[in-house]
Amino acid sequence: MNTIGKSFRITAWGESHGKALGAVVDGCPSNLPLTGEDIQKELNRRRPGYSLFSTPRKEGDKVEILSGIFEGKTTGTPISAIVYNTNQKSKDYSHLKNTPRPGHADLSYKLKYGNYDYRGGGRSSGRTTIGHTIGGAIAKKLLDYTHNIKIIGYTTKIGNIEGDFNYYNSIENNEKMINEELINKIENNPLRCPSSNADEMKDFVLNAMENKNSVGGVIELIALNVPVGVGNPIFGKLNGELSNAIMNINAVKGVEIGRGFESAELLGSEMNDEYYYDENNNIKLKTNNCGGVLGGISCGAPLVIRVAVKPTPSISAVQSTINIENKTTENLEIGGRHDPIIVPRVIPVLESMVAIALSDLMIRGGFIHPCKL
């Protein structure tokens, strides 16, 4: 499927070396103030060729809105947006037609579909997340406009190097941790990492590049101001919908909510979040080990999500593969232009998937009117 969502639906389309990529967003209520710039600023955060640690393939990724906006506001009809490819070098991939790249989707696509566009990974390329980002930009605007929901992501780990900044290290100030100073620090760092040891992580990536290799990492996502009651108790749980949306990104290999796998090591007395009333008689959690979700439903605390991102599979080192046509084993040396690490560029995509899942659940749950704002 190329569509995600039930009430707020995103259909992403296009291939890495095709003419264009884009998305159709259906189910966005009318009267939401929205311009091309709202989408462009998110696309700019994920576009390639503008960082030491991204692919040299330089693309402007200029978005054009084709429908669904009138006089600066949504109309409630499908919003269609397109981004044209301008810097393809398809000849770099001609030798890969019958030799699937280890770690890529080449083999599974070839065996499932037979005829597929292998250039630059085709439909499985990270470039196809342009559609996700278009949908996410609209979802972010909807959540912010209706409920002041803020979503932010940042790198907490590169390879085996753990950063010293994460939500649980900052729990005393968790309600105020997302601010302009932090956002600027993240966005001005090539790894989108606010930790004090980010330079050590940079050196780790540079060393991998020198050795014709790639690295992965861990990203933390925080969503503030999510109201109580989003999600369902059995199927359609908030944590289930978030995990599903995030795991639909090719590079993602794992998702944790709150303390995640660490919770298996804790005692019940350590894991349980005790309650109290604040000065305004609002129910609060003393801790937030649950990551903002109890029984599949938001509890008013910040959503805390961690995502494991694998190393970029395209590496310059020689690897062993097969030739599907000749039925032989051979060595493969991948050319083309590739990211040594995808972690910083995938952050806006992951933020988008969180926003899309939340928007869909909140429309379905009555928090956002499905027709007009």
UniProtKB/Swiss-Prot annotation:
Domain of life: Archaea
GO molecular function terms listed in the Swiss-Prot or TrEMBL record: chorismate synthase activity; FMN binding
Catalytic activity: 5-O-(1-carboxyvinyl)-3-phosphoshikimate = chorismate + phosphate
InterPro entries: Chorismate_synth (IPR000453), Chorismate_synth_AroC_sf (IPR035904), Chorismate_synthase_CS (IPR020541)
Keyword entries, A-Z: Amino-acid biosynthesis, Aromatic amino acid biosynthesis, FAD, Flavoprotein, FMN, Lyase, NADP
Binding site for FMN: R123, S124, S125, N250, A251, G295, K310, P311, T312, P313, S314, R337
Pathway annotation from the record: Metabolic intermediate biosynthesis; chorismate biosynthesis; chorismate from D-erythrose 4-phosphate and phosphoenolpyruvate: step 7/7
Gene3D superfamilies: Chorismate synthase AroC
Catalytic EC class: lyase
Note accompanying the cofactor annotation: Reduced FMN (FMNH(2)).
One Gene Ontology cellular component annotation held by this UniProt entry: cytosol
Cofactor(s) named in the record: FMNH2
Keyword Amino-acid biosynthesis among UniProt keywords: yes
Any Gene Ontology biological process: aromatic amino acid family biosynthetic process
EC number(s) recorded for this UniProt protein: 4.2.3.5
Chain positions recorded as NADP(+) binding sites: R46
Described function: This reaction introduces a second double bond into the aromatic ring system.
Family in the record: Belongs to the chorismate synthase family.
Stated name of the protein: Chorismate synthase
